Design a protein with these regions (language model features):
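N-terminal Rossmann-like FAD-binding beta1-loop-alpha1 element of flavoenzymes
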Residues: 5-32
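Active-site/ligand-binding neighborhood in enzyme catalytic cores
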Residues: 124-241
Length: 449
């Protein structure tokens, strides 16, 4: 069967839903094609035995005004939930326990996380010379400007927490452009941060509060609210997009189905593009689709009686130097309401990542053993105590890694969009990996079509 629509969005993850939602609000004729039998992409909320937990992203950051504006538009069907004030605390593992990551000068001086020499070294950061390598990795930049221990016990675990990546491979100007620009534009992290804080802000700018967020009841509520009024075709298998002779686009799926449209927006992972866009020359496709995605195993662990153990923080991160088998542990029940029964606790463990891709092949029993060992040794629960909930989720293509080849990928995307009018290549292969980035990108694309 053949249909005609103005715009087709490929993929019903957060980027695709955000894009289509804004287009629909403009009165545009838009339809989403999704391979899976459900919408939401990596976002999936579960409710089991009094626990509410996520199998994909746990939180986002209100990093753009578009995030706050989206929830305002969805008011009545989805409510923004800002994390508790205690979520500002981040814990870092060193030795045999967690230490709070300092957030002020006094804390930076007194913390046992950093060497004394580096504590003095940071005082000279505003006068340190700029780097000369435009593709300098995050880790090298941090060690050069702040010192080795700041790299090892602040930047390394931060990169593990955000990217599940290797800070010596992630290129700063692509992976952390705001950090890169502080040195590039102001010559210093400290001077740049002070200057940015003094810049005048509009009322709209202030909507980007940088606070951690979820949705009341879980992120699935956001997916449901976005998709409520949209035309979405799920189970769209063997999907292919081809340009037509008359300057339109043909989207075929399930063998006999076809939608012809004027514009098509792809929001799928880079690894799915070769099969989706067979008309793109191999050389150009290789420059886009070679993006590496770090694999992640996420383990949800819940206890109905926390026995008084309390972790009022966002989570605990583990520096690679400490050689633990987990990347970090998030504390969702410390951040948000009604994530566990009264008196209980909910934890989200992250295992694997770019530096331990082999962990994806470990059995459920091996993953369970790793998690329980951390449950007892790191969170200090009694050895005889077992969790009331333990769920394992495996994500082969979890988080894209913005390495030094990213510039070539971005240039290829731009060239292809110029070469093929009406084709928009979106998703997390560009413009950032966080939920805030995905919402921002969706709104930006919708306003540009």
């Amino acid at each position: 069967m053949k249909q005609q629509h103005e715009i087709v969005v490929i993929g019903a993850g957060l980027t695709g839903l955000s894009t289509a939602f804004h287009l629909h609000r403009q009165g545009r004729d838009v339809v989403i094609l999704e391979k899976a039998d459900r919408v939401g992409g990596q976002i999936h909320t579960y409710h089991e035995n009094g626990f509410t937990f996520e199998s994909g992203p746990n939180t986002g950051v209100v990093s753009f005004p578009e995030v706050a504006e989206l929830f305002q538009m969805l008011e009545g069907s989805c409510q923004l939930e800002i994390a508790r004030e205690s979520s500002k605390r981040r814990l870092i593992w060193k030795g045999n326990r967690f230490h709070e990551l300092p957030c002020d000068p006094v804390g930076a001086i007194t913390t046992p996380l950093f060497r004394l020499s580096d504590k003095f070294r940071i005082l000279g950061e505003p006068w340190r010379k700029k780097g000369t390598d435009p593709d300098e990795p995050v880790g090298a930049l941090a060690a050069r400007r702040l010192g080795k221990s700041f790299y090892e016990y602040a930047v390394d675990p931060f990169v593990s927490g955000v990217y599940a990546g290797d800070p010596m491979k992630l290129t700063t100007r692509y992976a952390l452009p705001k950090l890169y620009n502080l040195e590039a534009n102001y010559g210093s992290f400290i001077r740049g941060a002070i200057a940015k804080a003094k810049e005048p802000k509009t009322d709209r700018d202030r909507l980007a509060t940088k606070k951690v967020f979820s949705a009341v009841g879980g992120l699935q509520r956001l997916v449901e609210a976005l998709s409520k009024d949209l035309r979405i075709i799920t189970g769209a298998n063997n999907l292919k997009v081809m340009p037509t002779a008359d300057g339109q686009w043909s989207c075929t799926y399930n063998g006999t189905e076809e939608i012809v449209c004027r514009k098509v927006v792809t929001t799928v992972g880079a690894y799915a593009l070769p099969a989706l866009l067979p008309f793109i020359p191999e050389v150009q496709m290789q420059k886009m689709s070679n993006l590496f995605y770090a694999p992640i195993i996420q383990v949800i662990l819940g206890v109905k009686n926390a026995r008084g153990l309390d972790f009022p923080a966002f989570g605990g991160l583990v520096p690679s130097k400490e050689q633990k088998r987990v990347l970090g542990i998030l504390f969702p029940s410390s951040c948000f309401e009604q994530r566990c029964p009264d008196g209980g606790a909910l934890y989200s463990y992250f295992i694997g990542g770019a530096r331990h891709t082999d962990y994806l092949q470990k059995s459920d029993d091996e993953i369970r053993e790793i998690t329980l060992e951390a449950f007892h040794s790191m969170l200090k629960y009694p050895a005889d105590m077992q969790p009331d909930l333990l769920r394992i989720f495996r994500h082969e293509h979890a988080i894209p890694q913005y390495w030094s080849d990213s510039g070539e990928r971005f240039a290829t995307i731009e060239a292809l969009q110029q070469q093929y009018p009406g084709l928009i290549l979106a998703g997390n292969m560009r413009d950032g990996i966080g939920m805030g980035n995905r919402i921002h990108q969706g709104a930006t694309i919708a306003s540009s079509i």
